[in-house]
């Protein structure tokens, strides 16, 4: 139900499962440029009504362990927005960004610029990166898929694949495809 609430405001009343509201407050504030106020009240228990669709894009997964390099991240920006900053420690299987397509992509954020002894009159320009997506615990829980986990430490919230090894992930994916084909 939608009705006026005075002072150029609207009041929306709707029923939604709690699992569907995880991560929605941040999205609502973004959509309304911080002007929305959200209040939740328990209405009733209800039977399961089906899956709630999550994100549709894949993720960018680190394929090496080490410190992220700004130059490598700059070269990979066209693949999708990053969730890490240069200098962050990454490991194999860690999610470092969101892919622009619907599949997961293994990337190397450690590859530095090839240096030469040749000097030029034009200096190398400083790499300018798009600010990374900041993950809060609520946002991370809403973001992950079934094959992903959230790591919470006192200093950071990180996302990773359940299976860190890419070969294990491919094997598991093939096994699931075989199960659905026989079912």
Language model feature labels by segment:
Residues 1-183:
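Accessory interaction regions appended to the cores of large information-processing enzymes
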